[in-house]
Amino acid sequence: MKRNNKSAIALIALSLLALSSGAAFAGHHWGNNDGMWQQGGSPLTTEQQATAQKIYDDYYTQTSALRQQLISKRYEYNALLTASSPDTAKINAVAKEMESLGQKLDEQRVKRDVAMAQAGIPRGAGVGYGGCGGYGGGYHRGGGHMGMGNW
């Protein structure tokens, strides 16, 4: 009985941690993985900088809920893996949900990249490539957004 109480308390603590800290990780200014900085291209004009900033701000606003959901699913996935008897079916279901969320974020990222190209902002000029490819510092994909002049 003591073990069940400890497991329940640990699960509640993990859930509270996931609910309270996820917003910080999904935040608009976390990290510099997908921020905007010059990478050897020609300098952007003031108009291009403003356009790029708006495109990035819109992208982060539009993907905020998706990024939060992905982080919550990662917490759930990790909790399922650390259970005393891991449920393979539940773990696989959560993994598929994470994959689906990742694909939705990829689609939004492509839309952002197309908007940047259509605005005449050269690839690599004023746009960071994301340290690990896209969604958030330690989460295998870039997600932090610091914006121009905010380093």
From Swiss-Prot:
Residues 1-26 form the signal peptide. It is found in: Periplasm. Its main location: periplasm. It comes from the Bacteria. InterPro entries: Metal_resist (IPR025961). One of its GO terms (cellular component) is periplasmic space. Keywords: Periplasm, Signal, Stress response, Zinc. Belongs to the ZraP family. Part of the Zra signaling pathway, an envelope stress response (ESR) system composed of the periplasmic accessory protein ZraP, the histidine kinase ZraS and the transcriptional regulator ZraR. The ZraPSR system contributes to antibiotic resistance and is important for membrane integrity in the presence of membrane-targeting biocides. ZraP acts as a modulator which has both a regulatory and a chaperone function. The zinc-bound form of ZraP modulates the response of the ZraPSR system by inhibiting the expression of the zra genes, probably by interacting with ZraS. This is Signaling pathway modulator ZraP. It comes from Salmonella typhi.
